[in-house]
Structure formats: structure tokens, C-alpha cells
């Protein structure tokens, strides 16, 4: 369901309300075509002047009533006053006493003498008029009064155009005005017109003197600018020097990479030497080292014969229960060590002589020593000499 009221429905509601108000306000004169002395309420006849039948004003139907109102009949409903009451002249009041709107949009105006105060039953009619005006003003917009508009022209208005003003014509009735068309006061589209300024009055001209000389502080500003320029050039020189060191930094990086590569090569060679010669730095045989690690001190506590402990023998014997005894145990028979095969070591030393010794004379001397070597110690001596000559 549409919650908004259309303009046609609004016009119908206003018209229905006006008809109801007119019905109750015009009850004393209902059913007559003209106003006569018999139908006019006492106290109202002296007030009504003029002949309203001759001053009926027909207005166009209001645009807000919609197409539905335009389609109705154009009948005229007027209020007529007898000619005897029309002889007295009067002035038109700003708002009519009351009006009956018909189906065709015809509005009849009733005039009132402003010098006569409402008395009797006319007072109730006046109150009804006020209520009706409030109802009309609630739904109908009052016509706007136009203000004098001065047409703006470049160079100022002419003498004849200064006295001309555009004024909207008024309407003789209480119906809604459809408005009137007038020329826009502005020649620049939607921009509002601007009031012309009055001609300037004569004034005393200003004294014009010689322009002042340059300020003293200008020299100081120039000195500051020169100093800033010098500092900027100095900074540029320093930046150029820093950029020139970039190539040297790159060269240092390359040298560091070379040093790291050389160090890695030396470490690899040292690891190879350690693998090829896993000897002891002290020159002590492994059996002696094991024997020194197995020696320990035995402490005897409690009663017993300790005479054997004072002997000069460095060996201490124990029985099955780990008690020191003077009787020595039978010595264990040592197994003879098998003779090591030196052929493999000789092949390795021959390969070392070929790869590590570049001098032909030294190479020939190492080969002769290798041929005469028959023990492991001799072979180890030859390996040490080959490594020293290579370094």
C-alpha cells in the first residue's frame, strides 16, 4: 500500500473540507439564488455594499488539484445582493468574507465596509471566516509578492531604465495564484543579480612619492644565499669522494674472497696430512701409553702381613680376594707381534713423491731412500721429508 498521498487526493480532501465548511456557514441563505432582505441576517445587510454579481472573478483552476478536478463541470455558484443594497460604495477588504468554490474553479468575492465593526450574528460569520482562512493557509501557499528588480547591463543602466521596475499583478480574490512569468534579472544563468553600486563621490587624490630604495637587509640575504651555495658545493665534493671509494671497496671484497679460498685450500691439505700420518706427536709407543694409564695405587687396611710392601719391587700382587700377597703370579706369555706388510706404505709414498716433489733431483733421492727402507720407522721418516719439501 502506498503511504504517500498524491496531489490529486490532496486536492480532493481540501475541496471536500471546504464544501463542508461552506455548507455549515451558508445555512441561513441555503436554497436561494440571490441575497434579499428576507434572507440576510439582521445586522449584516448594512455591512454588505456593492453588487457582487457584477464583480465575479473567474480564476483558472489551481494546478495542485490534478487532472481529476479539471475534468469536472464548470458551474458557477455566486452570492447575489439586491440592487437596493448595492448603491452604497465601499472598499475592498484584503481578504473576502467567505467564498464558495464550485466544480469549475469560479470564486465570488464579497466586500465589506472597513468602517463598520461586526455586530450581532455577523460576528459569528467573521469567526467562521477566520477559521476558514486558517484552513486554507494550511494547505494552499500564499502568492508571493514581487520585489522591484533592476535589470543589470554592462556599463550601468540608462536614464530611462533606472525608473523601470517589474511588479507582479495582484489577484482580486482569495484563490491560489498560478503565478506570472517574468524575465530573469540576471544575464549569467542561475547566478543572482547584483545591485549596482552608486557612483563614487569626488575625493582628494592620494599623494604619490618616489619609491623607496632597496632594503638594507637585502645584502644580508644575498650573503646567506652565497654561504649556503658554498656549503652545498663542499658537500657535493665530499659525496664525490665517497662515491670514488666504491671501486676500492669492491676490490677489497674480491681480495677477501681470494684469502678465504686460499685458507680453505690449506685446511684441506692439513686434513689430508693428518689422515696420511696418524702418528703420536710425543713419539711414545701406544703400549707404553696404555701401561701408564693402567697403573694405579692399592691401599691395604686392617690386620695382616705387610712385610712384602717394603720390598723394592714395584709390582704389587693380589690374590683371588684382592688381598696383597707376596707370592708372585705366573707371568703371562707375550705374543710376538706379526710383521707388518710394508708394500702398501711403499706404494703410497711413491705416489706422494710423484705428486708433491717437483725437483727431479729430490725426487730421485726420495726414490733411492724408499728402495733401501725396510722398517716402518724409515718409511715414516721418508713421508715427513716429502711433506716438508712440498711446503
Curated annotation (Swiss-Prot):
InterPro entries: P/V_Pprotein_paramyxoviral. Residues 343-391 are annotated as: Interaction with the nucleoprotein. Keywords: Coiled coil, Phosphoprotein, Viral RNA replication, Virion. Its main location: virion. It comes from the Viruses. Residues 1-194 are annotated as: N-terminus domain. Residues 218-245 form a coiled coil. The modification Phosphothreonine is found at residues 10, 16, 91, 150, 165, 250, 258, 282, 298, 375. It holds the Pfam family Paramyx_P_V_C. The modification Phosphoserine is found at residues 188, 257, 292, 294, 301, 374. Residues 216-279 are annotated as: Multimerization. It is found in: Virion. The N-terminus consists of a long intrinsically disordered tail. The central part contains the coiled-coil multimerization domain (MD or OD). Forms a four-stranded coiled coil structure. The C-terminus constitutes the alpha-helical X domain (XD) that binds to the nucleocapsid (N-RNA complex) and the L polymerase. Homotetramer. Interacts (via multimerization domain) with polymerase L; this interaction forms the polymerase L-P complex. Interacts (via N-terminus) with N0 (via Ncore); this interaction allows P to chaperon N0 to avoid N polymerization before encapsidation. Interacts (via C-terminus) with N-RNA template; this interaction positions the polymerase on the template for both transcription and replication. Interacts with host RPS6KB1 kinase; this interaction may play a role in the viral replication and transcription. Belongs to the rubulavirus/avulavirus P protein family. Essential cofactor of the RNA polymerase L that plays a central role in the transcription and replication by forming the polymerase complex with RNA polymerase L and recruiting L to the genomic N-RNA template for RNA synthesis. Also plays a central role in the encapsidation of nascent RNA chains by forming the encapsidation complex with the nucleocapsid protein N (N-P complex). Acts as a chaperone for newly synthesized free N protein, so-called N0, allowing encapsidation of nascent RNA chains during replication. This is Phosphoprotein. It comes from Mumps virus genotype A (strain Jeryl-Lynn) (MuV). The gene is P/V/I.
Amino acid at each position: 500500500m502506498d503511504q504517500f498521498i498524491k496531489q490529486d487526493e490532496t486536492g480532493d480532501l481540501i475541496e471536500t473540507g471546504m464544501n463542508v465548511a461552506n455548507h455549515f456557514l451558508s445555512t441561513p441563505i441555503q436554497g436561494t439564488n440571490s441575497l434579499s432582505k428576507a434572507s440576510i441576517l439582521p445586522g449584516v445587510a448594512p455591512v454588505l455594499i456593492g453588487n457582487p454579481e457584477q464583480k465575479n472573478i473567474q480564476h483558472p483552476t489551481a494546478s495542485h488539484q490534478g487532472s481529476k478536478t479539471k475534468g469536472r463541470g464548470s458551474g458557477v455558484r455566486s452570492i447575489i445582493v439586491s440592487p437596493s443594497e448595492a448603491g452604497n460604495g465601499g472598499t475592498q477588504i484584503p481578504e473576502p468574507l467567505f467564498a464558495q468554490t464550485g466544480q469549475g474553479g469560479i470564486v465570488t468575492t464579497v466586500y465589506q465596509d472597513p468602517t463598520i465593526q461586526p455586530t450581532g450574528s455577523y460576528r459569528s460569520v467573521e469567526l467562521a471566516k477566520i477559521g476558514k482562512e486558517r484552513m486554507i493557509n494550511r494547505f494552499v501557499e500564499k502568492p508571493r509578492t514581487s520585489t522591484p528588480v533592476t535589470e543589470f547591463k554592462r556599463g550601468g543602466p540608462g536614464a530611462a531604465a533606472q525608473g523601470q521596475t517589474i511588479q507582479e499583478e495582484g489577484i482580486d480574490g482569495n484563490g491560489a495564484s498560478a503565478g506570472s512569468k517574468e524575465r530573469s534579472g540576471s544575464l549569467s544563468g542561475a547566478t543572482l543579480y547584483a545591485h549596482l553600486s552608486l557612483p563614487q563621490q569626488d575625493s582628494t587624490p592620494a599623494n604619490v612619492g618616489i619609491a623607496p630604495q632597496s632594503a638594507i637587509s637585502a645584502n644580508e640575504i644575498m650573503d646567506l644565499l652565497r654561504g649556503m651555495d658554498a656549503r652545498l658545493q663542499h658537500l657535493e665534493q665530499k659525496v664525490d669522494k665517497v662515491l670514488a671509494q666504491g671501486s676500492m671497496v669492491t676490490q677489497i671484497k674480491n681480495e677477501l674472497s681470494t684469502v678465504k679460498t686460499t685458507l680453505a685450500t690449506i685446511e684441506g691439505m692439513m686434513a689430508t696430512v693428518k689422515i696420511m700420518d696418524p702418528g703420536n706427536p710425543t713419539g711414545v709407543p701406544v703400549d707404553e701409553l696404555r701401561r701408564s694409564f693402567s697403573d694405579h695405587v692399592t691401599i691395604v687396611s686392617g690386620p695382616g702381613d705387610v712385610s712384602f710392601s717394603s720390598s723394592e719391587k714395584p709390582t704389587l700382587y693380589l690374590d683371588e680376594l684382592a688381598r696383597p700377597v707376596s707370592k708372585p703370579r705366573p707371568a703371562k706369555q707375550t705374543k710376538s707381534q706379526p710383521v707388518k706388510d710394508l708394500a702398501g706404505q711403499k706404494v703410497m709414498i711413491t705416489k706422494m713423491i710423484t705428486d708433491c716433489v717437483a725437483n727431479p733431483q729430490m725426487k730421485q733421492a726420495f726414490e733411492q731412500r724408499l728402495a733401501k727402507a725396510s722398517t716402518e720407522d724409515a718409511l715414516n721418516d721418508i713421508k715427513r721429508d716429502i711433506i716438508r719439501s712440498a711446503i
